[in-house]
Design a protein with these regions (language model features):
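Active-site substrate-recognition segment that forms the wall
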Residues: 41-60, 82, 156-161, 169, ...
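Flexible, glycine-rich terminal cap/loop adjacent to redox cofactors
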Residues: 190, 206-296
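A short alpha-helix-loop-beta-strand transition element characteristic
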Residues: 2-4, 88, 142-143, 192-202, ...
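Glycine/Thr-rich phosphate-binding loops of Rossmann-like dinucleotide-binding domains
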Residues: 4-7, 43, 48, 130-133, ...
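A Rossmann-like FAD-binding core segment of flavoenzymes
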Residues: 51-153, 216, 223, 227, ...
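FAD-site-proximal beta/loop scaffold in flavoenzymes
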Residues: 12-29, 116-189, 196
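Glycine-rich dinucleotide-binding loop and its adjacent helix/turn
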Residues: 1-54, 58, 83, 87, ...
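A conserved FAD-binding loop/helix module that cradles the flavin
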Residues: 68-79, 165-223
C-alpha cells in the first residue's frame, strides 16, 4: 500500500510529507500540522511534540483514533492536551498553498486552528492498496476499482494457484495480520487445510500513553446487537502504575452476556502494546470472564 494523497495538497513540495518522510527528517519543524488523527498521525504527534515541535492535529471525525472506543482514547487525548498538542475535531483542510515562509493552510469545520502557516504538513489520512499497480490483471487476477484483490479464507485469489496477502487484500492494514495471512497461504499452497479464521486482530498505537485493543469494541457490539458486559480496572488502583507516576490508564474486558466468553478488550497506558497479547489469547482461547475474575 501507499499513503493516500489529497488533491488540494501540494505533495510535490518537500515540506509536505507522509509517514515515511516523517521518519526521515533532518531537522525538527517548529510548527507541524498533522492531517489525520488516526494511529499514525497521533504517533507522529507524540514523537514531534517530545522533540519540541508545536504540533496541530486536524481530524474530520468527531473523535481521535476512529475505530477505537472513545473511553480508550480519552486518557491519550487528555495527555496530548496537557503536553500542548492542539487537536481540532470535525475539522478539515480546504486548501493548502506553498509559500516562501511555509505551507499556507485554510480550514473549515467546528474547531479552527489559530495558525495558518506551517513549516511542515504531515498527511496521515490513510493508505491505499497497490493492487492496480502490480500488473495482477495480466495473470487474470481480479482487482477492484479501489485497488484491492479479493481472496478466500485460504488467501487464494480468483486464480486458484495465485495467493495474495497483506494490505492489498483489505483492512486492517497491519503487518502482523499480513504475517498470519502469509502462514495460511504457504500452508494452503502446500496442500494443508489452513484457513484465515481469527476472532481478533490487535491494533496498537505507540503513543504516550499507548492505546491497544483487540476483538470487538463496545461500538461494534452495539452495532451488531450483541448483548455484552464489561469489566474495567483503573490503573489508579495499581501500585505499580502509581509508583511509575502513570496511573491515567485502565484495562477493559468485554464479554458476551450469554456465554461469558471474552469477545474483546482494550488497554490504555504504558506498555499497553505488550499487555494486549494477553487479551488476544483470552479471546482466541474462548476464556471465561468468571474464570479470569477468579485468577490471582
Amino acid at each position: 500500500s501507499e499513503p493516500v494523497q489529497l488533491p488540494f495538497i501540494p505533495h510535490d513540495d518537500p515540506r509536505v510529507i507522509d509517514s515515511t518522510g516523517a521518519l526521515d527528517l533532518t531537522d525538527i519543524p517548529e510548527r507541524l500540522l498533522i492531517l489525520g488523527g488516526g494511529i499514525i498521525g497521533l504517533e507522529m504527534a507524540t514523537v514531534y511534540r517530545a522533540l519540541g515541535s508545536t504540533v496541530t492535529v486536524v481530524e474530520l471525525a468527531d473523535q481521535l483514533m476512529p475505530g477505537a472506543d472513545p473511553d480508550l482514547v480519552k486518557p491519550l487525548a487528555d495527555r496530548l492536551k496537557k503536553q500542548g498538542v492542539s487537536v481540532h475535531l470535525k475539522t478539515k483542510v480546504t486548501e493548502a498553498r506553498a509559500g516562501k515562509q511555509g505551507i499556507e493552510v485554510a480550514f473549515d469545520g467546528d474547531s479552527l486552528p489559530e495558525a495558518t502557516r506551517y513549516d511542515r504538513v504531515l498527511v496521515a489520512v490513510g493508505r491505499a492498496p497497490n493492487g492496480a499497480k502490480i500488473g495482477a490483471e495480466k495473470a487474470g487476477v481480479a482487482v477492484t476499482d479501489r485497488g484491492f484483490i479479493g481472496v478466500d479464507k485460504q488467501m487464494r485469489t480468483n486464480v486458484p494457484h495465485i495467493f495474495a496477502i497483506g494490505d492489498i487484500v483489505g483492512q486492517p492494514m497491519l503487518a502482523h495480520k499480513a504475517v498470519h495471512e502469509a502462514h495460511v497461504a504457504a500452508e494452503a499452497a502446500h496442500g494443508e487445510k489452513a484457513y484465515f479464521d481469527v476472532k481478533q486482530i490487535p491494533s496498537v498505537a505507540y503513543t504516550d500513553p499507548e492505546v491497544a485493543w483487540a476483538g470487538l469494541t463496545e461500538d461494534q457490539c452495539k452495532q451488531q446487537g450483541i448483548k455484552y458486559g464489561k469489566g474495567v480496572f483503573p490503573w489508579a488502583a495499581s501500585g505499580r502504575a502509581i509508583a511509575n507516576g502513570r496511573d491515567e490508564g485502565f484495562t477493559k474486558l468485554i464479554f458476551d452476556e450469554e456465554t461469558h466468553r471474552i469477545i474483546g478488550g482494550g488497554i490504555v497506558g504504558t506498555h499497553a502494546g505488550d499487555l494486549i497479547s494477553e487479551v488476544c489469547l483470552a479471546i482466541e482461547m474462548g476464556a471465561d470472564a468468571v474464570d479470569i475474575g477468579k485468577t490471582i
